[in-house]
Design a protein with these regions (language model features):
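A cross-family acyltransferase "interaction/gating" segment
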Residues: 89-90, 104, 136-221, 225, ...
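Catalytic core of membrane glycerolipid acyltransferases/transacylases, capturing the structured
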Residues: 8-28, 35-37, 50-106, 156-157
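Amphipathic coiled-coil/heptad-repeat helices and related helical stalk/stem segments
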Residues: 62, 85, 108-112, 142-143, ...
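Residue-level preference for the first positions of well-ordered beta-strands
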Residues: 53-55, 124-128, 160
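N-terminal membrane-anchoring alpha-helices
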Residues: 1-43, 241, 249, 253-274
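Soluble extracytoplasmic domains of inner/organellar membrane proteins
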Residues: 115-116, 123-125, 129-142
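C-terminal alpha-helix
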Residues: 232-241
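Short amphipathic alpha-helix with an adjacent loop that forms part of the alpha/beta core around
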Residues: 46-50, 114-120
Length: 274
């Protein structure tokens, strides 16, 4: 892990300094390498949005979501400002051009303007609207304030929003239940280092990622209605994945090189199931 990180970080620093377009792709390469090291096997359903910019809206179980989603979603994460100061991971977040936000309501408008500016530059953003992580067996209520940027047109067009659900479903090829799923979760007052060490020794892990239908705020009339829709779709997606109701995807990858074509013959239903 450290060797892979030390190898790529200098390249990313140079790419960002000289504004070379590859800087937007390098984080995805790093995440895919980490997936391979930790033996994460990703099962992909649905079709990834080709539109730029797109706001990807995702559920949040653990810091592992960053690695899993970073391997398949071309974009920058939106994270709490405290992450900026984390040893090593704060540096990695900055090198992925993460947008850091504070939880204070007084800064909401400022953060919304910053995120809108990034979208206007053509950057995709990845949002965790729950505002925190959980045990992986459910989806917490979405905070509609995070969807304020979706109310603004980007280059004269409504912003594309794609709900994406991620669920931790297998360990060494065997489906896991409610009691084991929290092994992947990181929430509350859990320490990072012991949890990361535990994950590294768990064996081959399976994650299910579903790309749901792309929507815009115009379809729902308000950011609150859009947030409610995304919450319902993602909740259903997680439920389908952890209960085994999803038909196995045609493609499982250690190194998900072509997520745009994953599970090519199927599209998510309106209910959110793939």
């Amino acid at each position: 892990f450290l060797g892979w990180t030390v190898l790529l970080v200098p390249f990313q620093i140079v790419l960002i300094a000289f504004r070379i377009p590859l800087a937007k792709r390098m984080p995805m390469i790093w995440h895919r390498g980490v997936c391979r090291m930790f033996r994460f096997r990703l099962e992909l359903h649905g079709r990834l949005s080709r539109e730029r910019p797109t706001l990807f809206v995702c559920n949040h179980t653990s810091y592992l979501d960053i690695v899993v989603l970073g391997a398949v979603l071309p974009g920058s994460f939106i994270a709490k400002v405290e992450v900026r100061g984390w040893p090593l991971f704060g540096l990695l977040a900055r090198l992925q051009r993460t947008v850091f936000v504070e939880r204070r309501a007084a800064r909401t408008a400022q953060h919304r303007d910053e995120m809108t500016a990034r979208l206007e530059d053509g950057d995709n953003l990845i949002l965790f609207p729950e505002g925190t992580s959980n045990d992986g067996n459910r989806v917490l209520p979405f905070k509609s304030a995070f969807f304020g940027m979706a109310e603004k047109n980007i280059d004269g067009r409504p912003l594309k929003v794609q709900p994406v659900s991620v669920a931790y479903t297998r360990l060494d090829g065997i489906p896991i239940g409610r009691r084991l799923r929290p092994l992947f979760a990181w929430y509350g007052d859990m320490d990072l280092a012991p949890h990361l060490w535990s994950v590294a020794g768990m064996g081959r892990s399976g994650m299910t990622v579903q790309f749901h239908d792309v929507v815009t705020v115009e379809q729902f009339g308000s950011r609150k209605a859009l947030a409610a829709h995304c919450e319902n779709v993602i909740s259903q997606g997680v439920s389908d994945a952890i209960s085994g109701r999803l038909r196995p995807a045609r493609r499982r990858r250690w190194w998900p090189t072509k997520p745009l074509y994953a599970d090519k013959g199927r599209r998510p239903s309106r209910s959110g199931a793939a």
